[in-house]
């Protein structure tokens, strides 16, 4: 690992790293020797994929490009304590679209820290990395190491890196050549059993009364069609999350909020269903009784077929100024996506999603998309989508609002719409220029997606400049200016917006960013607002190997979106999160979200509250942990605590036992008399799921 590519630019690596490679018919073996002062090593034993905030740990990434075309690059990583992380990357226009952390691969790591640094050993089954179906294999491969030196983060790599080529994963120059490796079909069974017991107080002052336990069992089956393609079937799957979502402040949001997908089933091959539009959002498959998935790959294409029967069907209606949400009953789901990969610079495809509701109603969506790269620095990306909908006749949504002379209320209306996206990007080492056009009709609806906003024609023009300096106290800086022009489909003016971003990276692995966002004009619910501007400061810092900090401060003018008569208020919001490592095993993560919108021309506030959260984890080893999460929501006077003991030796095998203890004002007690720390609802749960290779 000879080259430093950040902050240096293909300069000699400041620390030595040696890599040793071997393979058998079933596994690839890597040994990595990372030289450093052991007192400078950062990190601790942690759960899989929970990388420290701001990458505050010493870590080694192995990158594999089995098809040599950047369609799917697999990053398998380990920190100095043997704790794993795995990521799937693809050719894309931004880091947010490029990296998919939901990918899970089964591999083993062991590590040791010694007087001249640390070593990590990887044992990776061939079956964990989809690859061309041939006995003689040639894969793209390189190694990246990250460490902190003199207070600043440093990346070194086994390949040189051209900063004028924004496709980092297209620049994997190393080759793994492995001959006479036969394909060995892998079949996996994944049975589970689970039980949960819930109860609540029948009346104030009474003890919690528990009902009967709910016991579930199910099984998943995965069959390797070949070394790149699989078929999966899951019957009565348990798609529940064992860790509560971190509550977002939505008191002044006119649209539904999106939460990340945390369920392991939605990993293999699911990167094919990531779209600019949000046409597919896996959390809309809420409670399936059965689901199947087939992923197919060959030299020039990739495909996925996903089907499910959902017992509880979320229903989201996007709108011009706000969205509407309800929950329906049983629905039948199909999704198909095919992508043609010509080379690392050209890929295009088509897709369809279909949802049919029991009792009537359906949503069908069809689209084509593509990404083309020219002369390394130019990219053109497009998505053109058409939807055809028949509303169910149901009471899932209660609203008298209308769109395109149709009612939001679900009354069996038929309609169709479209969503078109076109993006042009030019990116070099220092400059980035973006033109992005979106055209979303008022009748557009994605029944398997997350599209809370429609009825808009939206043009974004952005120009940015970034410079890496490599100085101790100023690692780099960036400047970006972005303008937005938005009209509705009828041509009525909706917004005229300007964003200015300034950022620096400095000592202590600290990134400081300032954003000024001003709406020169904004129309909301037929009311015009002018010169509504606010500032945001964001600071992410790793000043020591034990401490990581994140602070976001927002102040300025904002619209009170959820008032019957919206008006301008004075906003002040703060988010603070700290991650502190105690020794090699204990991690403490408190956070606080505060938000207030004060009335300007009269006394009082539109809202004022906070959400406080504390997450503490003791990691006995890389597989076993005890975690306690507690959160108090001042906006809704709710408190919960969630203890969880978890054993997770690989992405699929898991045993956990835990509970949720909640308070909520279910007896309509006066807010002054309500005790938010008195538990009114209680749940205990246990689950065992074990991966069996056949």
Sequence positions of predicted segments:
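Exposed, low-structure sequence patches enriched in small/polar residues
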Residues: 287-289, 302, 363, 371-374, ...
